[in-house]
């Protein structure tokens, strides 16, 4: 069983699980996370270092940092213009169930219902087999899900490339202030995670898989980090029946961003959506089946496809919860 210890950083005491790290640049094994961050050891193969700054383990490779510079600049401009985040600590405590800012209440209503469904109907199935669980929170944002999981005594690790103090990993300080054992914050990309193989029980894509530029590569990397029998969970990524429906959505959004912000927000060729044929192909690639859960988001959400059909608009996305199951579980 993993344990934790107290590591001093600029932001105070940070409790880290005993995890093995590998270099995000060359994949060479580095050793224990606590030793690597305490001593800022360089990779013996390529010289890359994973350091701890403001309580965040900086594990984005140099080439990754360069690749995402423009994306992060544009993404941050959009998010700040939309009024994401808050200076009020209470805002973060209310997530995902309430948006105290009132600026994105409908979006958080969906996020809240997705997580409520996951927490009440899906997570207990995993907890019967093992608890606490070691969990990758992929696309953790401000860390709200890791906080909720930590309250259930699990061991989450929050992963994101956005470290913004209002909207990214930097905002997790509000959650850390209330926890005796703080969950680790790791700046890293999905396709090059700094963890050795087989250390986690769940890999949860937290409204984030659609940011992947290559689903095969991203899901293969998540599976690498999982123990035998570990599960991939996909929350709040848009799913369309047909590919062309998602492509129409993407074209609409690019036009909207160009008009509103002066750029299309496509510097990174993210996939942006899933569709049913792609899910089938990804299941074959991974050697799994997707168990599909469909939370109830209310009548307004339920009637969206009918309204779209009557008005001649493209079919809207669906937000399913997808959980990977090995094919052996169906025999």
List each language-model region with its residue ranges.
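A short glycine-rich, Lys/Arg-flanked "PGG" loop and its adjoining helix->strand segment in the class I
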Residues: 216-231
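Conserved class I S-adenosyl-L-methionine
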Residues: 54, 58-129, 148, 233-257
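Short, low-complexity, charge-dense intrinsically disordered segments
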Residues: 327-331
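A short SAM/SAH-binding and catalytic strip from SAM-dependent methyltransferases
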Residues: 202-214
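Class I SAM-dependent methyltransferase SAM/SAH-binding core
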Residues: 136, 142-192
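N-terminal auxiliary segments of SAM/dcSAM-dependent transferases
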Residues: 2-86
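A short acidic, Gly/Pro-enriched loop at the edge of an enzyme's catalytic core
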Residues: 191-203
């Amino acid at each position: 069983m993993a344990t934790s210890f107290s590591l001093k950083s600029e932001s105070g005491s940070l409790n880290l699980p005993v995890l093995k790290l590998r270099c995000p640049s060359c994949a060479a094994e580095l050793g224990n996370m606590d030793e690597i961050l305490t001593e800022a050891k360089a990779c013996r193969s390529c010289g890359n270092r994973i350091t701890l700054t403001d309580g965040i383990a900086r594990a984005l490779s140099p080439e990754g940092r360069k690749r995402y510079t423009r994306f992060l600049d544009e993404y941050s401009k959009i998010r700040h213009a939309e009024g994401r985040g808050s200076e009020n600590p209470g805002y973060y405590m209310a997530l995902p169930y309430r948006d105290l800012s009132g600026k994105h209440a409908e979006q958080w209503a969906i996020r809240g219902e997705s997580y409520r469904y996951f927490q009440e109907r899906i997570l207990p199935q995993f907890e019967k087999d093992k608890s606490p669980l070691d969990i990758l929170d992929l696309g953790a944002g401000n860390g709200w899900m890791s906080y909720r999981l930590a309250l259930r005594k699990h061991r989450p690790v929050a992963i994101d490339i956005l470290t913004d103090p209002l909207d990214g990993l930097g905002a997790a300080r509000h959650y850390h202030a209330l926890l005796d054992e703080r969950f680790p914050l790791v700046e890293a990309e999905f396709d090059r995670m700094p963890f050795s193989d087989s250390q986690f029980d769940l890999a949860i894509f937290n409204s984030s898989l659609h940011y992947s530029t290559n689903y095969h590569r991203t899901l293969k990397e998540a599976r690498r980090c999982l123990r035998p029998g570990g599960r991939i969970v996909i929350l709040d990524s848009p799913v369309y029946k047909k590919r062309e429906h998602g492509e129409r959505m993407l074209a609409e959004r690019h036009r909207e961003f160009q008009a509103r912000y002066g750029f299309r927000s496509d510097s990174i060729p993210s996939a942006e959506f899933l569709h049913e044929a792609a899910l089938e192909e990804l299941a074959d690639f991974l050697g799994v089946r997707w168990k599909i859960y469909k939370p109830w988001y209310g009548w307004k959400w339920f009637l969206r496809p009918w309204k779209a059909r009557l008005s001649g608009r493209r079919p809207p996305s669906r937000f399913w919860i997808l959980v990977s199951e090995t094919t052996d579980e169906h025999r």
